[in-house]
A protein has these predicted regions:
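Low-complexity segments
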Residues: 1-59
Length: 59
């Protein structure tokens, strides 16, 4: 998924990052946002939904 685009049909499944996890993560690059999906933190462009990074929280 990194380097690809988040599927439009799945955008509704992106959730805010759990507050207790947010303090452990580096800030996203300027212009990008982070969301939570299925155990992963997804760093993405909120306009194009281009995925720049994934962080596995279950590992």
């Amino acid at each position: 998924m990194v380097g690809g685009y988040y599927p439009y049909a799945d955008i509704g499944y992106l959730q805010p990052i759990p507050p207790d996890v947010y303090g452990y993560l580096p800030p996203p690059p300027p212009g990008y946002q982070m969301g939570y999906y299925d155990g992963y933190v997804v760093v993405y462009d909120p306009i194009t939904y281009f995925i720049t990074n994934l962080i596995d929280l279950m590992q």
